[in-house]
Design a protein with these regions (language model features):
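Two-component/phosphorelay signaling modules centered on CheY-like receiver
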Residues: 14-33
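Acidic, metal-coordinating helix/loop segments flanking the phosphotransfer/catalytic sites
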Residues: 34-52
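Receiver (REC) domain active-site loop signature in two-component systems and cognate sites
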Residues: 59
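Hydrophobic/aromatic residues positioned on beta-strands within the core alpha/beta folds
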Residues: 85-86
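Short, glycine/charged-rich "phosphate-handling" switch motifs in NTP-dependent
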Residues: 103
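C-terminal output helix
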Residues: 110-119
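CheY-like receiver
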Residues: 124-150
Length: 150
């Protein structure tokens, strides 16, 4: 599935990081690397290409959303598929991540079948093209004012 490129997992909780790496291995990904924060993920991505990044949303000093924005703003990294994970997503989290260019969202704890499905969907997408600047941060209520009336 990964065309021999490695997968990068970013999570600040060591047990979850090891668990996700193990799940990826069970799904047939032979080369999976893990890091515990966004700055280290960016450093690694600038040194090596990755088939996919799976990142926790809530991390410090650079959270998953900030990491995603950095990746999408970099022409050499912008086509890297990106999945955000978290124990819960609220409406605003999903909206901000969608605007920033997330390819998928997965709730923790992972169901291996859902993970497998999301991986297939994300890894089979066409590369992005930089046609226009990324949209400014917005909320759906700003884009669709009538939503606030219901």
């Amino acid at each position: 599935m990964s065309d021999t490129l490695p997968i990068l997992i970013v999570d600040d909780q060591p047990k979850l990081l090891r668990l996700i790496i193990e799940l990826m291995s069970r799904l047939g990904f032979p080369d999976v690397e893990g890091v515990s924060d966004g700055p280290e993920a960016l450093k690694r991505m600038r040194e090596r290409r990755y088939a996919l990044v799976i990142s926790d949303l809530a991390m410090a000093p650079l959270d998953g959303l900030q990491l995603l924005r950095e990746i999408r703003a970099d022409d050499s990294l912008m086509n890297t598929p990106f999945i955000l994970t978290e124990t819960s997503f609220d409406f605003e989290d999903i909206n901000h991540a969608h605007v920033a260019g997330a390819d998928a969202f997965i709730l923790k704890p992972f169901d291996i079948n859902l993970l497998k499905t999301k991986l297939k969907q994300v890894l089979n997408r066409k590369p992005r093209r930089r046609e226009a600047p990324l949209p400014a941060e917005s909320t759906l209520s700003q884009e669709f004012p009538l939503l606030g009336k219901f």
